[in-house]
Each structure stands twice: as structure tokens, then as C-alpha cells.
């Protein structure tokens, strides 16, 4: 009999691996999940990190291999960027305890670096090289707590899940708004940076280069609409988890904010009629898109400005300018998500959080300033290179003239002079290789988080989440949950592909 029970528990645990589902009040089944996950985590071993193999595994959606390589990469030291991916890889592979531990660490890292450097990194980035330390995109700063709340919930720890949402609403959001409130949408540049640009513009005009053309492709100024201010997913979870915890103090405020953020949100989610219960289904679908580097060349990628090297050498030095900034033009891979509750009905899930849209907003906030920063760096380097190059070429030419009449020596010096001119031009072109856009981001967030709900009598319910993708593929994930009178249940399902 004991063997039968053990087999049954193992099968039940395996079911939860494929599609996490739980009733908020029933922690026993979640304890089974946590135990099973802990046992599985021992089998995941670090795999020697290889960038090419890692990218291949990413493209194939081989998350176990990605996790193994990320474990190897972060075994000694992990920055925010790597920790974001490590936490989400743990989440995707069902290792919720490990994911939560890494999210906690990442949260502390982001809070420390962001609160100390946000004004410098955004307001004064134009006079500095690209920051080496990654502080996270704005939505990542807030959603790290939201995802951690989900991790705690999936381990059956409702109290810690709610605490993450409280930390977000009471501590991080006010601090975030204070720091970001004015900085992000300013059009003006740091005064010292503007002075430097004006100085460089004068230097370029001496070489008959009109730097005003460089602003022709300046990205649009961000607006208030581009500022990520709230996590609708956090509000949704707060609405359900606090209600399950017996806390109804924020139901009205959460409902109002959520309705303003998600127009199609069903207001019935905030209230459970007498004698009924609620099945809430949260579905994580797809994989977030990636930023790309936008490169702009002046005069163009195939043409140059020509700078005279002086009256003595009569050479023209080809000069080209390259500026970079982050760009995003990702396409949705998720066509839709439907939730089927057996013997009850089918509903199309509403997008609660769109990570692609979050990423696009983040790019719009940064693009203009990062273009200006790139312009400053590139011009400064090129002007320095031009000045040094002209000085070397003219000095070499004066030496060449002194050898006039000495056929062999003059011939050798002429060859050396031509080589110097060529290498100077090549050196100026090589400067462009150092100019790269900062397109770092967490790569394993879902594309969308979708939600649907059913008001039903108490009882056991079965159903499935149907994921439809733009490539025509359809994936179904079954679930089972218990509904108690007056209480919400939350099913968490995912198909990250």
C-alpha cells in the first residue's frame, strides 16, 4: 500500500511540473511540488559556458542547457544581467525555490545600483562611456518582485508572496517614481555635455563638416506614455492573493488601477458572489523579444567626408561617423490564449502584462539620450584622431621633402608616407568598432502574461489552457483545481516558447 501511495505522489508531482496549478488555501499539494523540485534541482549540473552553444540552445528553446551554462557562468560571480536570466531559467524549468533565492539577490543588487546611479546613468551618460554595470531595464526593476511573488506562491508560501507585492507597492514604487519622475522625459542634455558637443561642432566646422546633419536621425523624445509606471501583473496578483489572505483593504484600489491599465479586465475578478468561488487562470506565454543595435552612418555607410591634411601634404583624409542606439521592432509570437473549464465554458484570456511592450517603452526612454551619448563619444574620438593623424602625416611629409633627390631613400620614404596615410584612415575607421549600443536585457521573461476567470460553485474543476502561436502551432496544458466557497483559486500555467 505504501508503494502505491509513493507512486501516486510521484505522478501527482510530475503533473505539477508540466503545468503549475494550486488552490491558494491548500498548501499540501504545493509542498509535494516543492519537494519534487528540490530533488530535481540536484540533477541540474553546470555545463561549461560557450557563447555560441548557449545562443544555439536559446534559439532551440533548450532551457535546461541554458540553465546549466548559466550556472557555470555565474558560479563565482553573477551580475544583475546574468542573475535575471538565471532566476527566470529556474522559473521556467520549475525550480521555484532556486528562482526565488536568485530573485531575492537580484532585487537587492538592482535596488543598490539603481538608487545610487540612476541620475548619473541617465542624466549624464552622454559624457561617459557605456556603463559597465547593468542596472536593469525599468520594467525589470519592478517586475523582479512580481515574479518572485509568483515563485513563493507556487511553493505554497502565500505570506511571502504577499510580502513581495507589499515591498513593491510600499517601498520600490515610491522610490522609483521619485528617482525617475523627471529625469527620463527631459529633452535637455547635461550642461557640460552640451558644452562638449558645441566644442566638437566648432572643431568639425574647421574641417568643413557640418555636424548639424547628425541630428537628422535623432530618435524621438520620450513622452510620459513611455514611462513604465505600474505593473498590472502585480496589481492582478495583489487583488487575488490579498483576497485569499483575508485582506480586502486594497481590493478597490487594485481593481481601479488594474481597470485603467487593462481595458478588457473583467471587474467581476474583484468580487465573489455569495455561495460561489472563483477560478483564476494566469498563463505565461511566449518569450520576450530582443533589442537590436541601430547604427547610423554619416555621410552614409558607403561615403565619407574628406578632410584636407594641410597645405604641405595635399592629402585628403576620409572620415566617417558612426552613431548607435538601442532599437526594438519585435513581433508578437503569441496569437492568443484560451482557457477551457470543463462543463463550464471557454474564455479568451486577456493580456495582463505585455513584456514586449514593456521592452519597447524602455527602449524609447533610452534611445534619444544614448544616441546623443554615442554622438558625443564618436565625435570626440574622431576629432582627436583627425588632429593626431594630420600632425603625423604633415610631419612625415616634411621629412619626405628633406629626402628629395635621394632616389632610393625618397622612394622608401614615399612608400612609408603612403602607408601612414592609409593606416591613419584605417585607424579612424577602427574607432567605429568601439562604438556599440547597450542592448542588454533579461532574455527569459515571457512575452505576455494572460488571465481569465470563472465564477463557479465550490468543487473540483478540470480544464486546459490553449496556447496559440503565430507559426500556427497550438499547445494545450491541462490543469485541475479546487474551488472553495468565498475564496479564489489561482492556476498558474506557462508555455515559454
Give the location of each predicted region.
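C-terminal soluble interaction/assembly domains
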Residues: 397-497
